[in-house]
A protein has these predicted regions:
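Membrane-embedded alpha-helical bundles of multi-pass enzymes
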Residues: 2-200
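Generic, ordered loop/turn and secondary-structure boundary motif
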Residues: 36-41, 136-139, 152-154, 261-264, ...
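Soluble catalytic regions of membrane-associated enzymes that act on cell-envelope
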Residues: 198-323
Length: 324
């Protein structure tokens, strides 16, 4: 069996199976694997498959299958948090990409419309429901690369479009669906955006550096709060923190969100312990706390504790959304 373009054009089954494969490639571009080039390759293959059919039902199936494997891999950790939620979220967001595939096939040049349509699907995912679920995204996949510099111009939305458009460029070039001049125009636009983002970015290198210890306390995974005490997480993080030494010359020590769960942080045992560690290491501590805020209410905050005990900065989360 020869896997030629004609074969995929004739075989709907081959297209659907390959859509699953292309989504898996995008999934493996995300942490913990982090093979970022697979994001561009996977999207390019998916776009090429969509170009081989005009049927709305199949366009939807291709988009949904592509997104199901992408998101099911990228958000796999949710299974241990809430298995029903994991299944619902993957299926819900996959329908967005199924719908985007249909819309893109009906509007103008697909080399332009597909990246825009699927970017809009991601915009909806970033926004709804409950303030959005921006997990397993294309910007996360390319974050270790210079391509991520586009985020300084247009945030994750521009970066999402950039990755999708770059993939569409390769699809257009190799499928010869687009004229050579059309491919060149797309390439020039992407190059200009990348150069501007890299060289005219509002984010500047100060030339200074900070030495920061990031503490992850460890412990068994998948333990629900109802099956543990709030103190368990604190003890584990203190144990790891105590392996740090003054000779490490730290500027700051960072603890994760929600490690400390107390009624009033400033009056708590945990505050005193953090101050003691800050004095010992002569470094400020940036710690995540959950603190009571009246009857049946609480707040999530990140606070900065100085070696002298001063809380020099505090940020309270403005809006809670699922998973952060």
């Amino acid at each position: 069996m020869k896997l030629s373009r004609d074969y995929f054009k004739r075989s709907a089954r081959a297209r659907l199976l390959t859509a699953v494969l292309s989504g898996a490639l995008v999934g493996f571009s995300l942490p913990p694997w982090g093979w970022w080039p697979l994001a561009i390759i996977g999207v390019a293959i998916f776009f090429a498959l969509c170009n081989l059919t005009e049927k709305n039902r199949e366009q939807f199936a291709l988009g949904a299958l592509f997104a199901i494997t992408w998101l099911s891999l990228g958000m796999m950790w949710m299974w241990w948090l809430t298995a029903p939620g994991y299944i619902i979220v993957v299926l819900l967001f996959s329908t967005l990409h199924g719908s985007a595939a249909i819309v893109a096939n009906k509007i103008g040049s697909t080399s332009i419309s597909r990246p825009i349509a699927h970017c809009l699907a991601e915009v909806i995912r970033f926004s709804l429901p409950f303030g959005g679920v921006p997990l397993a995204t294309l910007p996360i996949a390319i974050s270790p690369t210079r391509l991520a510099s586009t985020a300084t111009l247009g945030g994750p939305i521009l970066t999402t479009w950039f990755v999708l458009q770059l993939a569409a460029l390769f699809t257009a070039y190799f499928s010869r669906r687009e004229t050579r001049s059309g491919v060149l125009k797309i390439a020039v636009v992407l190059l200009v955006i990348h150069l501007v983002a890299t060289n005219v970015s509002p984010v500047k290198n100060t030339g200074e550096s900070l030495r920061i210890a990031i503490v992850q306390g460890g412990g068994p995974q998948g333990v629900l709060a109802i099956n543990a005490t709030a103190r368990d997480a604190v003890d584990r993080h203190l144990m790891v923190t105590q392996t740090l030494q003054l000779q490490d010359n730290l500027d700051a020590v960072l603890w994760p969100e929600n490690v400390i769960d107390v009624v009033d942080f400033k009056k708590s045992r945990e505050y005193s312990e953090i101050v003691d560690e800050a004095k010992r290491l002569n470094a400020e501590f940036v710690v995540g706390i959950t603190e009571d805020a009246g009857s049946q209410r609480f707040t999530n905050a990140q606070v900065v504790v100085q070696p002298n005990g001063e809380i020099s900065s505090r940020y309270d989360k403005v809006r809670r959304v699922p998973f952060g």
